[in-house]
């Protein structure tokens, strides 16, 4: 059993802003229900360009529901410029903490928000799982590229493959890519150390 904070339990048992915004300005979808986690985030802007309404639908665990609920509370009233600066760590901070093995739930919320903002601006979805997606596919089970692994590692100061699994699920199914993930991390941190 996971050890959840009172805030996590409150957002899980009483999630805020569940559903879909009618005629949304932005829609972001990440994850895959077949893999166990999926999130759809919709928002509507007011006349001043602030997020007036935001809702979510998620297929996932208590941490996924709580993270999504907390995210909607966090960004309500923000401009898109302010909202796009929200990180998964901001979501975790609002909740108090999340078990390390559930950190991917906060990352999923941040990605859904970034996806919705990109689509609103007419930009490509940065998290689309298609052949044009940037980077080399490393984890076939969860569709995670080297670019995403590097991004998550830099943003969260992650140094081993197990930590990456907790944050973006890469390596969490068959495990065949764990060696590749560790090599990517080792190379990145060696390069960063050499730059100092």
Identify the role of each PLM range.
Residues 1-23:
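Extended low-complexity intrinsically disordered regions
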Residues 35, 44-110:
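Active-site- and interface-proximal helix/loop "cap" or "latch" segments in soluble metabolic
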Residues 49-59, 125-136, 157-172:
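Immediate flanking context of iron-sulfur cluster ligation sites
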Residues 58-70, 100, 135-149, 166-186:
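Local cysteine-cluster metal-coordination motifs and their immediate loop/turn environment
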Residues 101, 123-129, 194-196:
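Flexible, glycine/charged-enriched surface loops at secondary-structure junctions
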């Amino acid at each position: 059993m996971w050890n959840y904070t009172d805030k996590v339990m409150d957002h899980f048992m009483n999630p805020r802003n569940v559903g879909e915004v009618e005629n949304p300005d932005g829609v972001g979808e990440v994850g895959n229900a077949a893999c166990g986690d999926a999130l759809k985030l919709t928002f509507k802007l007011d006349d001043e360009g602030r997020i007036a309404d935001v809702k979510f639908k998620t297929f996932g665990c208590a941490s996924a529901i709580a993270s999504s609920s907390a995210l909607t509370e966090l960004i309500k009233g923000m401009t898109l410029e302010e909202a796009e600066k929200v990180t998964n760590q901001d979501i975790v901070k609002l909740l108090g903490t999340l078990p390390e093995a559930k950190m991917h739930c906060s990352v999923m919320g941040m990605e859904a928000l970034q996806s919705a903002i990109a689509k609103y601006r007419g930009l490509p979805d940065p998290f689309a799982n298609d052949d044009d997606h940037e980077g080399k596919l490393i984890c076939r089970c969860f569709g995670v590229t080297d670019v995403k692994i590097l991004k998550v590692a830099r943003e969260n100061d992650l140094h081993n493959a197990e930590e990456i699994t907790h944050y973006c699920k890469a390596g969490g199914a068959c495990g065949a890519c764990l060696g590749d993930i560790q090599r990517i991390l080792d190379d990145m941190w060696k390069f960063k150390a050499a730059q100092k």
